[in-house]
């Protein structure tokens, strides 16, 4: 793995469990970070599905503390693809998380279940988890959003709800809110009107 500077990765800091204010990462900066982290990931042969990451459409949130999130849409993602999701998961994009993880049954998952990428910079390194975002149709016909780590089955699956919000050309947007002392809610918005809430928490020690 090539050495790379950590500062762009560490600049992605959000607030869920430990901070007080969320800020959006400028698009140009998010794109630069995307190119670095996807280079570190490479092309894993055990990925649940292929994602053709679109660096120009990356979205990130930051705040105080050494925690960060970056979403990268698939280049083929369209509104029609979301609305017409099938039973088999198809690529929505990737989600990168640092020092925060999706809660599974109200607790942090075992680190062994996560897909961790280590970014080296001299004698320092940063560990970042990557999740493949997949959309699929639920039994009732609604759309689900799955976060895939190492396994072929999603680590977390939540509804991707069609709301009354105005549609947008923005493929993926991130926001969040604090919920408990060590938990928060990550809000993923797709094309302005599809939304998914994911409970997040601190990783295991």
Q: Where are each of the predicted segments found?
A:
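Mid-length scaffold segments of soluble, non-membrane domains
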Residues: 84-152
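N-terminal secretory signal peptides that target proteins for export/translocation
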Residues: 1-2
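Primarily secretory-pathway and cell-envelope proteins
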Residues: 19-97, 117-119, 153-205
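Bacterial N-terminal signal peptides
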Residues: 5-15
């Amino acid at each position: 793995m090539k050495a790379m500077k950590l500062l762009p990765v560490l600049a992605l800091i959000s607030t869920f469990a430990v901070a007080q204010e969320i800020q959006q990462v400028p698009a140009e900066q998010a794109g630069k970070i995307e190119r670095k982290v996807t280079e570190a990931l490479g092309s894993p042969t055990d990925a649940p599905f292929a994602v053709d990451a679109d660096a120009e459409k990356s979205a990130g949130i930051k705040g105080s503390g050494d925690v960060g999130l970056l979403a990268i849409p698939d280049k083929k993602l369209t509104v029609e693809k979301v609305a017409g999701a099938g039973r088999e998961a198809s690529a929505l994009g990737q989600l990168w998380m640092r020092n925060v993880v999706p809660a599974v049954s109200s607790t942090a998952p075992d680190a062994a279940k996560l897909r961790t990428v280590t970014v080296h910079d001299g004698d320092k390194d940063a560990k970042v988890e990557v999740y493949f975002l997949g959309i699929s149709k639920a039994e009732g016909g609604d759309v689900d959003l799955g976060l895939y780590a190492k396994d072929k089955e999603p680590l977390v699956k939540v509804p991707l709800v069609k709301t009354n919000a105005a549609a947008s050309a923005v493929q993926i947007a991130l926001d969040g809110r604090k919920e408990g002392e060590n938990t928060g809610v990550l809000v993923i918005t797709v094309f302005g009107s599809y939304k998914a809430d994911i409970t997040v928490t601190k990783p295991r020690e």
